[in-house]
From Swiss-Prot:
Its EC number is 4.2.3.4. The gene is aroB. One of its GO terms (cellular component) is cytoplasm. This is 3-dehydroquinate synthase. Binds 1 divalent metal cation per subunit. Can use either Co(2+) or Zn(2+). It is found in: Cytoplasm. The keyword Metal-binding applies. It is an enzyme of class 4 (lyase).
Length: 362
């Protein structure tokens, strides 16, 4: 079932997000519809490939494509240059040329790395996103950000490179472990908190249905998240302005991930912590009422996500924040929520004061 298509309007780089339930076996037809030819390298991981590679392979072969698998180890800890080289090795071994393309079958790590491989292999070949986690469906598969982590920071190496299409099948969420599923809900909260108050209301009212993985509620939540992000990306593809709002919760969230070596928290969990802290900072500066801050905290708690920063010395937090890609000469660009459904961007130069508000003192 195809529920709807959402257009990401970027002139000649525009593409559609196809949303549905049980539509994974349409991938071959979709690739033909967007004009792709040649060999398809399916980049996946050891968790997702056993579940969905055969469906993708059969669909692609029915559509007349040669298909080769490139299967990687699973986990954020593998989002690095060594694993990226494994993708290049697979592409070279399969003799992929510029007329070939990549299918990114998996979560955000696979999408980011496969997209970066597509952007850089032979100076660029097409790719299609097939996100299989809630987090990647509502965030990383939309907007063209690709890349890998560096030991000193998250996503420090990468490029903007748009896919030819995105295919989202919410039925793939049936096999997602509970913790991974909840992590994706954390990223969904972001869209309501700073960009759509009505969507935030929907999430509050439908939290139980979402937790039960109700298909209709999920399609609504995922499609609305994608539509909100698509609109922001269309306005600001390369994060020169308004797109920075999508980093709400990510500043401290990325610091948490860096300090814990990307092993203690899933991305959506770290973002949930970051959003709660951002709401506290927003309340401190008078941008957000206590009632709205408490609504954000309550929804995140109701969705089974963490809210408190892990304990590390303030100096370590400052060091992690100083490597944030949103740092400029005039300070750290911090996204605050203005009530619920709106935002403001602030340049914060006193990281010590910011951490004090969050309960991290010297």
């Amino acid at each position: 079932m195809i529920a709807e298509k959402i257009r990401v309007a970027l002139d000649e780089r525009s593409y559609d997000i196809e949303m549905g339930a049980g539509n994974l076996d349409r991938i071959g037809s979709l690739c033909r519809e967007v004009g792709l030819s040649g060999t398809a390298a399916v980049v996946s991981n050891t968790t997702v490939a056993p579940l969905y590679y055969e469906t993708v392979r059969l669909s692609m072969e029915r559509a007349g494509y040669r298909v080769v698998p490139v299967t990687l180890p699973d986990g954020e800890g593998y989002k690095n240059s060594a694993t990226l080289n494994l993708i290049y090795d697979g592409l070279v071994d399969a003799s992929l040329d510029r007329g070939s393309f990549i299918l990114a079958l998996g979560g955000g790590v696979i999408g980011d790395m496969a997209g970066f491989a597509a952007a850089s292999y032979l100076r660029g070949i097409p790719f299609v996103q097939i996100p299989t986690t809630l987090l990647s469906q509502v965030d990383s598969s939309v907007g063209g950000k690709t890349g890998i982590n560096h030991p000193r920071g998250k996503n420090l190496i990468g490029s903007f490179y748009q896919p030819k299409a995105v295919l989202i099948d919410v039925a793939t969420l049936d096999t997602l472990p509970e913790r991974e599923f909840l992590s994706g809900l954390g990223e969904i909260v972001k869209y309501g908190a700073v960009l759509d108050g009505g969507f935030f209301d929907f999430l509050e009212q439908n939290a139980k249905l979402l937790l039960a993985r109700d298909k209709e509620a999920l399609i609504q939540a995922v499609s609305r998240s994608c539509a909100i992000k698509a609109k922001v990306v269309a306005e600001d593809e390369r994060e020169g302005g308004v797109r920075a709002v999508l980093n709400f919760g990510h500043t401290l969230g990325h610091a948490v991930e860096t300090l814990t070596g990307y092993t203690r928290y899933l991305h959506g969990e770290a973002v949930a912590i970051g959003m709660v802290q951002a709401a506290r900072i927003s309340q401190h500066y008078g941008f957000c009422s206590q009632a709205d801050r408490e609504r954000i905290e309550a929804l995140i708690v109701a969705l089974g996500l963490p809210i408190e920063l892990p304990i590390f010395p303030a100096q370590q937090y400052r060091e992690a924040l100083s490597h944030d890609k949103k740092v400029r000469d005039k300070g750290l660009l911090f996204i605050c929520n203005q009530g619920i459904g709106a935002y403001r961007m602030e340049r914060l130069t006193d990281l010590g004061a910011l951490l004090e508000i969050c309960g991290i003192g010297e």
